[in-house]
Design a protein with these regions (language model features):
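Non-catalytic, usually N-terminal nucleic-acid engagement modules in DNA/RNA processing proteins
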Residues: 1-91
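Catalytic cores of enzyme domains
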Residues: 32, 39, 75-195
Length: 195
């Protein structure tokens, strides 16, 4: 096992094209429901590394003009961003952590197609398909905060990000939490935009 610091993890992630990398210690998930807790996936987890890639501002241009939607669909909300652009550097970062002697589980925040069975597959475990709340993980890793409409926001990209995570046994220094109200002043623009 070789020395691995939070700065090493962040540097490697950003070199691979991730826009933001934040770290939460496992204690920040205390009180999470068992089927949403990172330790249900990795019982000896010590840290959760949350990563973000931006959704380009230009992805909204065709929608705003009322002329072109596919850019947002493929390069923004899901499509290539979630299923191609994010997993590759996420996997590289998990390999980097494991190359330093710490087990790492890359976490894809997709929603299961159907509800899994409630019964655990082994005694003392939770049922299958544990589903982390990725926006809460992003908040716990200091990357941003949830606004009034429960949309995750960052200082650099606002709400235009997609999040993924790595659960690891590496004990990494956590990032400071963002003070609630730093980004969302409850102006209700999100509510007005949806009505």
């Amino acid at each position: 096992m070789t020395q691995l610091t939070a700065q090493d993890v962040k540097r490697f992630g950003t070199e691979r094209g991730l826009d933001l990398v934040g770290i939460a210690n496992i204690e920040r998930f205390e009180g999470a429901p068992p089927r949403m807790h990172p330790a249900a996936i990795m019982p000896r987890a010590k840290s959760v590394v949350v990563v973000a890639r931006r959704i380009l501002r230009g992805n909204w241009r065709g929608i705003e003009e009322g002329t072109y939607w596919p850019t947002y669909t493929y390069f923004g909300y899901h499509g290539l961003l979630n299923s191609f652009f994010m997993p590759m550097p996420l996997y590289d970062l998990a390999c980097f952590i494991e190359d330093h002697g710490h087990e790492a589980v890359p976490y894809y925040p997709g929603v299961p197609e159907k509800q899994p069975p409630e019964q655990p597959l082994r005694p003392g475990a939770v049922g299958p398909d544990v589903h982390l709340q990725i926006r809460i993980a992003g908040t716990a890793a200091g990357l941003g905060e949830m606004g009034w409409a429960k949309v995750f926001m960052t200082k650099k990209f606002g709400p235009r990000v997609r999040l993924h995570a790595i659960i690891t046994e590496a004990e990494l220094e956590p990032d400071p939490l963002m003070e609630p109200g730093t980004l969302c002043d409850r102006c209700m623009a999100c509510v007005k935009g949806c009505t």
